[in-house]
Amino acid sequence: MLTLGLTACATDDASSGDAAAKGGDGKLEVFATTGYLGDAVKNIAPDADVHVMVGPGGDPHTYQATTQDLELIQQADLVVWTGLHMEAHMLDELASQGDRQIAVGDELPEENLLPWPETDDEGNPLHDPHIWNSTDNWKHVVGTISDKLGEIDPDHKDTYADNAKKYQDEIDDVADYVQDKINTIPEEQRYLVTGHDAFNYFGKQFGLTIKATDFVTSESEMTPQDIKELAKFIAEHKIPVIFQDNLQNPQAINSLKEAVTAEGWKVEVSDKALYADSLGAEAPTDSYIGIMKYNADTMAEALGK
């Protein structure tokens, strides 16, 4: 048993002493900052005990750790977080976990990353942290998590690798599904306007122009002049629908709708929210695969009219 004070649950295929990084009865304890990461871990290591920090509707950009979160981080065999300044209020706590932590976004090749319009506290340029909206990036993340789990629990390294490969194949399948859905939208209507700027990777991969009423972080909203310029863009391109997301910023969306009306164009707000930085509470939006399909279906239904 680790000296971390784990509170593990039983599993049938592992004994308490078969890996240095297991709880007393053999079950890995994993702390994941987002539902996307937790879902990836569960697909790779379905017997692991996974605690997800930011639940449905939560915002990892602004989330601040609770006392319970900090206790669970200390107890975990592995802490999985996005990095790339996503968990902006928890950087020190997460990075200080040494070999027990991995910031999966930091493991991506730089050429896979998109720019972010902000800098860190020292003025260094950052990258867009919404990496799950690129299926190639997410496959890389799955491989990174699998490798790290294999280091912690070498007796099951091959199982993790096999599960990761199966999950990566599912991600390829969902990429094909999403592309087919987006292809049903007429090319001149492939504009996605949302309340949170989480879909730039999605747009790059699947062929959509992305606009949003905030910048990459949900804490950074557009000025009235920015809203006016975006409204003019919507009117000029005759974009029929704008989207809220599950972070819910209705004031900005409603302000944008009014500004579009002032430009002489009528735009609707979709009655279905897109899923941005957190999973949903129930199927199908409680998984990465489910959300990718749901978002694509929602976009195609609204923009393909």
List the model feature ranges, each with a label.
Residues 5-305:
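Extracytoplasmic metal-acquisition and chelation regions
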